[in-house]
């Protein structure tokens, strides 16, 4: 047990919550510190409530072996959750343009049930595709479920806007940085590779049970993601570097028209007017140039020692006040946060274990 070791998890999105839950189950004392909490389902400064939260890999084994491992682990976890109602099975369909990876590198064909290539009759002219059984979760409710599980284990939550890592380390033995886009501006992280990818979607009421991802027309990608509770996410957009949180009416019409062509069952009568729109959503996917960052780093506090009153004293006095601490990073997952969450959280927990076992003042970095 690690009851005397206090870990602060910075951020309460799906990555932070999943990491916190695994750590709490391992016996760590966990405190979640975040500006937005799981109940903040309408906050646009918080990525997790707006996600489609389905399981659809985009990386090949060559491009992303680490991500594939995370996704396989998450898939298995969600299968376990199906009987509880927190995850649901879907029939998945993906269609690609011929110049995409297409059927190449689909490592998940051995994981997902009923995987098979689509015949040309089920694809747009010149496109290729596959079908398989997949899973989704209800993003806001899933995060709230994780939070309840954490509270059962004694984990605590605090609403707080953190501007510097020094605030997060106050009273903590170790900090997990799951801040998403916050990594760009928090002092001590300052990762300018973190960037938003804007996503606009339409939430509709529908009994649809087929998850469709269509990029056969690269100029107009679309997707349909059913989730538990009879709701469907229709999308979407992929605006790299776009911070605009307003709803674009023209985009709404494009999304609805394209999704209706993909699956008429999203409408009660086969028309756009027959689509029961519940809400228009705009969220910012927390991406990172170079991909997700999951690694442990040793840093020295205070961060700016040149401005510290200690800098006026003798070197030995400064050293006595300075301390070296471990920061475990877990951010930059973009649109794959949910489908990689459990596997990434397992790696985070491993890094935390290693930090407590091996870091004894020596500056070093461990990367998975």
Curated annotation (Swiss-Prot):
Motif (Microbody targeting signal): 366-368
EC number: 1.4.3.3
Matches recorded under PROSITE patterns: DAO
Outcome following mutation: residue 152 to E: Increases activity on D-arginine
Cell compartment(s), UniProt: Peroxisome matrix
Outcome reported for the amino acid change (mutating residue 335 to G/R): Decreases activity
Entry GO CC: peroxisomal matrix; peroxisome
Induction description: Induced by D-alanine.
Record annotation: effect of changing residue 253 to R: Increases activity on D-arginine
Catalytic activity: a D-alpha-amino acid + O2 + H2O = a 2-oxocarboxylate + H2O2 + NH4(+); D-leucine + O2 + H2O = 4-methyl-2-oxopentanoate + H2O2 + NH4(+); D-alanine + O2 + H2O = pyruvate + H2O2 + NH4(+); D-glutamate + O2 + H2O = H2O2 + 2-oxoglutarate + NH4(+)
Molecular function GO labels: D-amino-acid oxidase activity; D-glutamate oxidase activity; FAD binding; glycine oxidase activity
Activity regulation as described: Inhibited by high concentrations of hydrogen peroxide.
Class of enzymatic activity (EC top level): oxidoreductase
Subunit details: Homodimer.
Protein name from the UniProt record: D-amino-acid oxidase
Organism phylogeny: Eukaryota, Fungi, Dikarya, Basidiomycota, Pucciniomycotina
């Amino acid at each position: 047990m690690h009851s005397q070791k206090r870990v602060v998890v910075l951020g309460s999105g799906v990555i932070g919550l999943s990491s916190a839950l695994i750590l709490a189950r391992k016996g760590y004392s966990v405190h979640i510190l975040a500006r937005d909490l799981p109940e903040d389902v309408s906050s646009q400064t918080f990525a997790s409530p707006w996600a489609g939260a389905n399981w659809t890999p985009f990386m090949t084994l060559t491009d992303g072996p680490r991500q594939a491992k995370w996704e396989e682990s998450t898939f298995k976890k969600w299968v376990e959750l199906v009987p509880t109602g927190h995850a649901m099975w879907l029939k998945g369909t993906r269609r690609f343009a011929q110049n995409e990876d297409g059927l190449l590198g689909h490592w998940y064909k051995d994981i997902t049930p009923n995987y098979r290539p689509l015949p040309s009759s089920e694809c747009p002219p010149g496109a290729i595709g596959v079908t398989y059984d997949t899973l989704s979760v209800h993003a806001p409710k899933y995060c709230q479920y994780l939070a309840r599980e954490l509270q059962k284990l004694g984990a605590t939550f605090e609403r707080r806007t953190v501007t510097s890592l020094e605030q997060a380390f106050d009273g903590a033995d170790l900090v997990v940085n799951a801040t998403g886009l916050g990594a760009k501006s928090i002092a001590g992280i300052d990762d300018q590779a973190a960037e938003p990818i804007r996503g606009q979607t339409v939430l509709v009421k529908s009994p649809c049970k087929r998850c469709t991802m269509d990029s056969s027309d690269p100029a107009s990608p679309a997707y349909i993601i059913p989730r538990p509770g009879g709701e469907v996410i229709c999308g979407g957009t992929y605006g790299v570097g776009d911070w605009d949180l307003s709803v674009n009416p023209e985009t709404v019409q494009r999304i609805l028209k394209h999704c209706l062509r993909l699956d008429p069952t999203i409408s009660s009568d086969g028309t756009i007017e027959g689509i029961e729109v519940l809400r228009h959503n705009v969220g910012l996917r927390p991406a990172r140039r170079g991909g997700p960052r999951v690694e442990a780093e040793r840093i020295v506090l205070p961060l700016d020692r040149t401005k510290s009153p200690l800098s006026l004293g003798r070197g030995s006095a400064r050293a006595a006040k300075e301390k070296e601490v471990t920061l475990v990073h877990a951010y930059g997952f973009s649109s794959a946060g949910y489908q990689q969450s459990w596997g990434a959280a397992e790696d985070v927990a491993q890094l935390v274990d290693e930090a407590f076992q091996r870091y004894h003042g020596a500056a070093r970095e461990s990367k998975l």
